[in-house]
């Protein structure tokens, strides 16, 4: 049984979040949680929260055994970018993109 959890509009860039997602793809959930706990990146905390949510969803909604679960799929898609302005010298301004991403985790007992 596959169970899904999503975090939409996460305030991290897709490029940074995908680095973390690649670490846990295909792993058992216990091992994935250990990896994320000791990964020193902001995106690791976001991915860990989504993974914990997926585990809770599997346990509550599907009655799955946590020991059998593994990370079947994990992917990070690009969300909308917030456009901000940073003042520069001589009256100019630069545009800053505050990027967001959609983190999706699918856990499965197969």
From Swiss-Prot:
It comes from the Bacteria. GO terms for molecular function: rRNA binding; structural constituent of ribosome. The keyword rRNA-binding applies. InterPro entries: Ribosomal_uL22 (IPR001063), Ribosomal_uL22_bac/chlpt-type (IPR005727), Ribosomal_uL22_bac/org-type (IPR047867), Ribosomal_uL22_CS (IPR018260), Ribosomal_uL22_sf (IPR036394). GO terms for cellular component: cytosolic large ribosomal subunit. Gene3D superfamilies: Ribosomal protein L22/L17. Belongs to the universal ribosomal protein uL22 family. HAMAP family: Ribosomal_uL22_B. This protein binds specifically to 23S rRNA; its binding is stimulated by other ribosomal proteins, e.g. L4, L17, and L20. It is important during the early stages of 50S assembly. It makes multiple contacts with different domains of the 23S rRNA in the assembled 50S subunit and ribosome. This is Large ribosomal subunit protein uL22. It comes from Histophilus somni (strain 2336). The gene is rplV.
């Amino acid at each position: 049984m596959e169970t899904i959890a999503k975090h939409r509009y996460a305030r991290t860039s897709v490029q940074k979040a995908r680095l973390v997602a690649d670490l846990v793809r295909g792993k058992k959930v216990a091992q994935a949680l250990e990896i994320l706990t000791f990964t020193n990146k902001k995106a690791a905390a976001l991915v860990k929260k989504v993974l914990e949510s997926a585990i809770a969803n599997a346990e509550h909604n599907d009655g799955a055994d946590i020991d059998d679960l593994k990370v079947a799929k994990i992917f990070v898609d690009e969300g909308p970018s917030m456009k901000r302005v940073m003042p520069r010298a001589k009256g100019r301004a630069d545009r800053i993109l505050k990027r967001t991403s959609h983190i999706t985790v699918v856990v499965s007992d197969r």
